[in-house]
A protein has these predicted regions:
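A short, hydrophobic beta-strand element within the central beta-sheet of small alpha/beta folds
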Residues: 76-89
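Helix N-cap/capping motif at the beta->alpha junctions
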Residues: 31-40, 61
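Charged docking surfaces used in two-component/phosphorelay signaling
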Residues: 16-24
Length: 127
């Protein structure tokens, strides 16, 4: 059975890239254009992994991440955070907040992404 991956990003071109790439690697892609839609799809689809952009309108990636990790039905879904933040210190400060129940994301990628880096990180996180 193909694993389901939910990609949450406000850029349609990025979602298209994810969708095509994930399909090519035998994953079932699910997409959402913002955090509100992403949380809804996570609850409906119960994906095996979530790719989550940090900078989005309506609901930021950090707020979405906090809601995922505080939801008893969703907290165990692994999340790969995708950000433009390249400094490890800045990235860690974003996640060093009690509202995520001390649960860091399972992966982190910095934009711009390559297909190879994305697939390697997904494979690492999914085991």
């Amino acid at each position: 059975m193909r694993k389901k991956i939910l990609a949450i990003d406000d850029e349609v071109d990025t979602l298209t890239f994810y969708s095509e790439l994930l399909d090519d690697y035998n994953f079932t892609p699910i997409t959402a254009e913002n955090g509100v839609e992403g949380l809804k799809k996570a609850r409906e689809e119960k994906p095996d992994l979530i790719l989550l952009d940090i900078m989005m309108p309506k609901k930021s990636g950090m707020k979405t991440f906090k809601e995922l990790k505080n939801d008893p039905d969703l907290y165990n879904i692994p999340v790969i955070i995708i950000t433009g933040i390249s400094k490890e210190v800045d990235y860690k400060s974003l996640l060093n907040r009690p509202s995520t129940r001390g649960m860091p994301p399972e992966g982190h990628l910095v934009k711009p992404l390559t297909a190879d880096n994305l697939i390697k990180e997904i494979t690492k996180v999914l085991g």
